[in-house]
Amino acid sequence: MRATEFIAEIDRRGFLGALGAGAMAAAGVPAEAKPRKPEPMAFLSAHMEAEEMLHKTALHAGMRGAELAQFLAQCYHESAGFGRMHEYASGAEYEGRQDLGNVNKGDGVRYKGRGFIQITGRDNYRRAGQALGLPLEERPELASRPDVAAKIAVWYWASRVRPNVANFNDTRAVTQRINPKLNGLADRHENFKDYKNMFVATRTGT
């Protein structure tokens, strides 16, 4: 599901109903837009709650405008529409990766990617935990909780992305700080435009 479709679905469920059809049209969201893959209400609702939590955490951290749109777009892509809080693979491929701090047997699986911006490896869990005052090294599964994942994503952004990006309209530069191989670059950029247009139309995100 593209971010445009996600935003349209939020409106149909009443979360953005007060904005009116004009605002949604200005955001580039067709009134008849439908997800490519219909999702059960409970599943979709969980996605919306995760997005709302992430959005609020980012606003509290001072993100606005293009930076906020880019942050949400990147998290949307990384977490498959705010619905996947851990990577599909088992993590066995990270076994023995000393560059990630995986020095003990089983560390690859234990510290596989989790969260909106998925952190991977014992060292990254330790750093995030120390920065946030959370026992992530001892309890890595906490990184899959939306409230914790939102804090981790903002921490990662503030420490790894923001200091290294001069222009948040540059999706390539932002993506390089999150996924150096630039996987899904076109999708990330389209979602960035969707969020940016929504902020303009609804006068939010500023």
Regions found by a protein language model. Give the residues of each.
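N-terminal secretory signal peptides and thylakoid transit peptides that target proteins
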Residues: 2-22
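Peptidoglycan-targeting cell-wall enzymes and recognition modules
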Residues: 36-48, 73-156
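N-terminal carbohydrate-binding/catalytic regions of secreted carbohydrate-active enzymes
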Residues: 51-54, 58
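Acidic helix/loop microenvironments that form the catalytic cleft of cell-wall polysaccharide enzymes
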Residues: 75-78, 166-185
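Boundary at the C-terminal end of the N-terminal hydrophobic targeting segment
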Residues: 31-33
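Low-complexity, Gly/Ser/Thr/Pro-rich intrinsically disordered linker/tail segments
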Residues: 194-206
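Surface-exposed patches in mature extracellular/periplasmic domains of secreted proteins
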Residues: 62-71, 84-88, 163-175
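Proteins synthesized as precursors that undergo proteolytic processing into mature forms
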Residues: 148-150, 159-166
